[in-house]
């Protein structure tokens, strides 16, 4: 459901975000040892925290108060997800992106390095792998 939202208008995305939050929180409560539940909640917070000013302004017109995301809360969810499943490359990608957003660039690079050491098991994770490699190469070029 969440993947479909990415291509919808902002109104549909915000409405869908509320549904995703509710069901994801229920999943975390019912499956507290499932790393993917924490990953989903981390992405939920990341994406809402990363919502542009224009989109957030539009969301405020449509809704009394749009859902609030937080990079710090996303960080907690991603760290918990990795604690429970240290072999899932997707969480390393999102944790690294979150570190970048909060200005912890060295931590982001360290997480990306750990992530690229894992083998990408699925096509979507292959995209995460390639993006992390690209970021690391760009950083290496800056150093030289």
Protein language model regions, located:
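Outer membrane beta-barrel transmembrane domains
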Residues: 77-80, 86-87, 97, 111
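Terminal, low-structured helical/coil segments at or just beyond the last alpha-helical repeat
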Residues: 54, 116-144
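Register position in tetratricopeptide repeats
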Residues: 3, 47, 101, 135-138
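Structural register within alpha-helical repeat arrays
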Residues: 1-4, 41, 95, 102, ...
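Short coil/linker segments at helix-helix boundaries
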Residues: 1-33, 43-83, 121-127
